Amino acid sequence: MAINSDEQQNAALSWTKAVTKNKEIVAENSNRLIPKGSKLNLKNPPRIKRKLSAWKGRTDRQAFWLKHNLIKKTLPGEAGEIFDELKMARAEILGSKEYDGAKLNIQNFSIDVT
């Protein structure tokens, strides 16, 4: 069965809104791995079904960032990038404790990125 891009993107956006309890989240096509504001960065889903879990992992980690990123402070330069990665790791850990399927998706995303 072929992957329906629109259905997958709508499902990812709906799931993110439900997890975060924020109906104001919107999707944008961006390479950003960390969401900015209330924007979920969605790329087109892969055409290969075995890569779908990694694509979902990219979405899951952003959903958890939007839900658990309570520290709004930013730092300049490289220190800010490191701080954001630490905040993302925290969000992934907290979210993965709630959703086992998302934990697997995030692991697949991490493998796919490296």
Please tell me what each predicted stretch does:
Residues 1-114:
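Basic/hydrophobic alpha-helical interface regions
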